[in-house]
Amino acid sequence: MGASMNIGVRGSKLAIEYAKQVEAKCFNSFHTNLITIKTDGDIFENKSIQDIGGKGVFVSAIEQQLLDKKIDVAVHSFKDLPAVMDSRLEISAVLERNDPRDCYIGTLFPKAIVGTGSPRRIAQLKTNFNVDFDIQHIRGNIDTRIQKLEQGKYDAIILAVAGLEALDLQHK
């Protein structure tokens, strides 16, 4: 093995799984350490993304670690990146895109309580269904969202197929 590489990543199962993919595809000749970093988006899980700063809440703490040279590489989900990046940083690699589809878990019916944290998904629900759903905000990692569904807090939740597949949860 060659040099050592510290890879900064959020601590969710999904983020770690994606970091392992980056590790295997980009850094297989290095000894690597996955360094999990809590972000504002992780710490303030009960607040909306807009209430805690909007775009960047899942990346700013990791990027600061990169700028402070505490990590060598940061792994992010593209959807979490702000439109304008810090000029001192660059995107060095992008893995092939996974399945871009969304799916629902649960039961959809008129007035169903549907959980999503995405403005895009809310717009798609309102545009693509002639049904009046009760769309409620939901935050948390995939496991947390599924748990909230199973506890009866929602009738259905909308999730990314790619995330479910990465965690081998597509059977849900």
Predicted feature residues:
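Domain-level signature for soluble enzymes in the chorismate/prephenate branch of the shikimate pathway
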Residues: 1-172
